């Protein structure tokens, strides 16, 4: 099929020129890095046949908006990472594993913050209370954010969570026991991290 390399229901590679793309209904899995680096891809229609979106499937694409159907049960790491034009992610309300809030992607129970839409123009973001994990590459490539705050409920901040956020200057981590990956701020060693030591004291790292 033109523009798509499909093997046994898996979309292995997109070979087209971008723009608005409709994925064929014969596809059940969007493979790892299938659209990686497709800067001219602005819109994609994911059919109800798709159950899995692989790691880095749309990494560094030109997507402006993406809609995830109810059929998708697994989204791999950094599937929509470093999409610097992406302003909103929506999830079908009948999806059992994922949901969206304010255009960002979460696990259905709201405990894992999976992906911030990196093209948003807001300069501040407060991770909602109840989130326990800030996921792999969650804020990767955000252009406009200067300040982010994570609540006491956050237990883990994973690899590359704030990687290459070009405007980021401060991250406030309110959980005194929050585990922060050594790679969470990869490429941004100059970010000021404010960590809660106890209820009355902050320290600057």
Predicted regions and their residues:
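Short, conserved catalytic or adaptor-binding loops enriched in Gly and charged residues
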Residues: 13, 184-186
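Structural signature of tandem-repeat unit edges
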Residues: 1-7, 15-29, 39-52, 61-74, ...
């Amino acid at each position: 099929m033109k523009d798509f390399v499909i093997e046994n229901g898996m979309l292995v590679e997109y070979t087209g020129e971008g723009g608005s793309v409709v994925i064929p209904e014969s596809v059940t899995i969007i493979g790892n890095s299938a659209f990686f680096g497709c800067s001219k891809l602005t819109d994609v229609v994911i059919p109800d046949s798709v159950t899995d979106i692989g790691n880095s499937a749309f990494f560094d694409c030109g997507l402006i908006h993406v809609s995830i159907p109810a059929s998708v049960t697994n989204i791999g790491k950094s599937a929509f990472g470093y999409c610097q034009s992406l302003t909103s992610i929506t999830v079908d309300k009948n999806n059992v594993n994922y949901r969206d809030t304010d255009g960002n992607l979460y696990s259905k129970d709201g405990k894992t913050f999976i992906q911030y839409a990196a093209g948003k123009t807001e300069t501040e973001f407060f991770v909602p209370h109840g989130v326990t994990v800030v996921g792999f590459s969650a804020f990767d490539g955000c252009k406009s954010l200067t300040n982010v705050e994570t609540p006491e409920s956050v237990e883990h901040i994973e690899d590359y969570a704030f990687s290459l956020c070009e405007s980021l200057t401060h991250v406030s981590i309110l959980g005194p026991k929050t585990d922060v990956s050594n790679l969470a701020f990869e490429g941004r060693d100059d970010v000021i991290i404010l960590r809660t030591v106890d209820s009355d004291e902050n320290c600057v790292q």
